From Swiss-Prot:
SMART domains: AAA. PANTHER family: ABC TRANSPORTER G FAMILY MEMBER 28 (PTHR48041), ABC TRANSPORTER G FAMILY MEMBER 6 (PTHR48041:SF83). The gene is ABCG6. InterPro entries: AAA+_ATPase, ABC2_TM, ABC_transporter-like_ATP-bd, ABC_transporter-like_CS, ABCG_dom, ABCG_transporters, P-loop_NTPase. This is ABC transporter G family member 6. GO terms for molecular function: ABC-type transporter activity; ATP binding; ATP hydrolysis activity.
Length: 727
């Protein structure tokens, strides 16, 4: 099965390979992205037949402008455990057990100290549960203030949250990408979000093309990401795309959680080589690894081994043999150093004393072999400004020079782009991804058409009789509830996008308000099509009254119902953890809305302690709106003469007998009632149904308002539920 390649009207730039290092092996400074863009610009003017330039992975000698130091990091959480009453109180071993819960403090990090430098890769290693991911979260400011003890500084200064989001990136373990976007489109959208507004579209495109070559994704540039139903790029390529999204703005700090997880050895090596290039371009790479191979080990600059939240080794890979030799467990020749170290750590963890001896030995070893503390000579702001002025594309950063001629000052806004730019880019991305999955909208449209066809044929051309009135009420109730149930199909959409949203907003790629508004705008065209199709089939098929104006209002009510239902489901998708629970909640609540809408039981007969549910029912207002639209004409008659007996046991009486009964009733009441006398108008039906409080337009506006209300709740659910921080 061949890969899915998205059609692109724009011609891709010719193949090029920016030179990341000196090919001859001579020492040189790492290439900044300003030089990278220049290389890209030059390469587009050269012949596309030039040969690819391999990257020299040797670490060049250079000064260290950035040093991330962490001192005595300690982090504990409370864990609930079951406490057995019989074992603690009763001396009778046969006594029944009564379990209660108590909390226990578990230390995930215990006095972790170390440092990382730009131009280098720091790898955190250890067995599962050793605290690797927790340490990365601590360094990336993903643990809530007050929970983490210790200090994390960059160039000796504590990073505030805004600054850290601008100069850092965090690559999650899972590859969360839009499946129907190509590799190039995915990176281009990331560039639109993260790169400074001062960069032109062409410069951003050049940055993307340079990054595609840096990541080794040139052959997959026009291939869609893919998912279970669409074949796309490989697992290793997906991982590199995920990395590319987070380094598009050239972060100074790059954190990665298990970047080689689930990859074969070749793909893993390719990913680490990419990270090495990123480090050599002037970034600081800090990542967790489970068990690196010998080939991966050669690319790492610093190692930090953890065991149950404590440091058991910290230093360069070259120090491993000497460290374990002095500890009394020399590494055998030709054996993988990291595998030996991890095996020994696991063996010690299973012993009576645990890894305490190794932890204490590491403290002494570090004191004896302590390196001099790195001094940058620059404050944090000066270092960042210097880095930006040399070509770093820190998210949204701009450099300005004072009129006095002093050194340039870099300004880093909270967001790289204004609100309207974010809105346009988000809408374009969502529409592009949706347009390539027409089956999703096709299924919803098909369901609406089938439901409308069934309603139209079941209630075909209803007459103005008591029976027709009852059938209209049932048709309206089912039609309004259908619009809400159809919206439940959209529940998985945001649940699939939620982690992408959380990753992007964690580092201020865009505002949450931009996402909510774009999400609403993109949904409107499909809702209009669904509403028009459903309204046209049911209105003319059932034979509803009102003519063209009645149809237009009926269409607006259907559209408002779809809008309110879509907003309600969107809000739920922001708070429920998974799809099945979401479906259960949606179906249950919509059933309650229908029950209290006024169709099954009139408002006047609803118990007082449940009347509040009647007024918050989403089905109530569109249901009453269509009733008012259909029965609002006071001159329209629905029960004439002998039709008064249609809903009674007398319906089976012969017509002549009904006429005589009607004459007898006329004499008794002292009024003339004939077979043509109107006994029930549309207004009478509205009175019987208890629909007298609001006009039809007010019912429409209330339905629309419910939609906006749930969109606002959706915004706050994103605001409160996407902090991405441990407690």
């Amino acid at each position: 099965m061949s890969r899915v390649v998205a059609a692109d009207d724009n011609m891709a730039l010719p193949f090029f390979s920016p030179e990341f290092g000196n090919v001859s092996g001579a020492s040189s400074s790492p290439t900044t992205f300003a030089q990278l863009l220049q290389n890209v610009d030059d390469s587009t003017r050269r012949s596309h037949h030039q040969h690819h330039v391999d990257v020299d992975l040797a670490s060049p000698d250079q000064s260290v402008p950035f040093v991330l130091s962490f001192t005595d990091l300690t982090y504990s959480v409370k864990v609930r455990r079951k406490f057995t009453w019989r074992r603690s109180v009763s001396s009778d071993p046969g006594a029944p057990s009564e379990g209660i819960f108590s909390s226990k403090t578990k230390t995930l990090l215990n006095g972790i100290t170390g440092e990382a430098r730009d131009g280098e890769i720091l790898a955190v290693l250890g067995a599962s549960g050793s605290g690797k991911s927790t340490l990365i979260d601590a360094l990336a400011n993903r643990i809530a203030k007050g929970s983490l003890k210790g200090n994390v500084t960059l160039n000796g200064e504590v990073l505030n949250s805004k600054m850290q989001k601008a100069i850092s990136a965090y690559v999650m373990q899972d590859d969360l990408l839009f499946p129907m976007l190509t590799v190039e489109e995915t990176l281009m959208f990331a560039a639109e979000f993260r790169l400074p507004r001062s960069l032109s579209k062409s410069k951003k495109s050049l940055r993307v093309q340079a990054l595609i070559d840096q990541l080794g994704l040139r052959n997959a540039a026009n291939t869609v990401i893919g998912d279970e139903g669409h074949r796309g790029i490989s697992g290793g390529e997906r991982r590199r795309v995920s990395i590319g999204i987070d380094i598009i703005h050239d972060p100074i700090l790059l954190f990665l959680d298990e970047p080689t997880s689930g990859l074969d050895s070749t793909s893993a090596l390719s990913v680490i080589k990419v990270l090495k290039r990123i480090a050599q371009s002037g970034s600081m790479v800090i990542m967790t690894l489970h068990q690196p191979s010998y080939r991966l080990l050669r690319l790492l600059d610093r190692l930090l081994f953890l065991s149950r939240g404590q440091t058991v080794f910290s230093g360069s890979p070259a120090m491993l043999p000497r460290f374990f030799a002095e500890f009394g467990h020399p590494i055998p020749e030709h054996e993988n150093r990291t595998e030996f170290a991890l095996d020994l750590i696991r063996e010690l963890e299973g012993s009576a004393g645990g890894t305490r001896s190794l932890v204490e030995f590491n403290k002494g070893f570090r004191q004896r072999k302590a390196e001099p503390r790195s001094q940058t000579g620059l404050s944090l702001k000066e270092a960042i400004s210097a880095s930006i002025s040399k070509g770093k594309l820190v998210s949204g950063a701009t450099t300005t020079t004072h009129s006095s001629g002093s050194s340039p000052v870099s300004t880093i806004p909270t967001f790289a782009n204004p609100f309207w730019v974010e809105l346009a880019v988000l809408a374009k991305r969502s529409m592009t991804n949706s347009r390539r999955q027409p089956e999703l909208f096709g299924i919803r449209l098909g369901a609406v058409l089938v439901t409308g066809f069934i309603l139209a044929t079941m209630f075909w051309q209803l007459d103005n009789s008591p029976k027709g009135v009852q059938e209209r009420l049932g048709c309206f109730a089912f039609a309004m509830s259908t619009t809400f149930y159809t919206c439940a199909d959209a529940l998985p959409v945001f649940l699939q996008e939620r982690f992408i949203f959380m990753r992007e907003t964690a580092y201020n790629a865009y505002r949450r308000s931009s996402y909510v508004l774009s999400h609403s705008l993109v949904a409107l065209p499909s809702l209009i099509i669904l509403s028009l199709a459903f309204a046209a089939i049911t209105f003319w098929g059932v034979g509803l009254d009102g003519g063209l104006m009645g149809f237009l209002f009926y269409f607006l009510v259907i559209l408002a119902s779809f809008w309110a239902g879509s907003s309600f489901v969107t809000f739920l998708s922001g708070v429920v953890p998974h799809v099945m629970l979401g479906y259960t909640i949606v179906v249950a609540i919509l059933a309650y809305f229908l029950l209290f809408s006024g169709f099954f039981i009139n408002r006047d007969r609803i118990p007082g302690y449940w009347i509040w549910f009647h007024y918050i029912s989403l089905v109530k207002y569109p249901y009453e709106a269509v009733l008012l639209n259909e029965f609002g004409d006071p001159t329209k008659c629905f029960v004439r003469g002998v039709q008064i007996f249609d809903n009674t046991p007398l319906v089976a009486v012969p017509q002549g007998m009904k006429v005589r009964l009607l004459a007898t009733m006329s004499k008794s009441l002292g009024m003339r009632i004939t077979s043509s006398t109107c006994l029930t108008t549309g207004y009478d039906i509205l009175q019987q149904q208890g629909v007298t409080d609001l006009t039809k337009w007010n019912c429409l506006w209330v339905t629309v308002a419910w939609g906006f209300f749930f969109r606002i709740l959706f915004y706050f659910s994103l605001l409160l539920g996407s902090k991405n921080k441990r407690r």
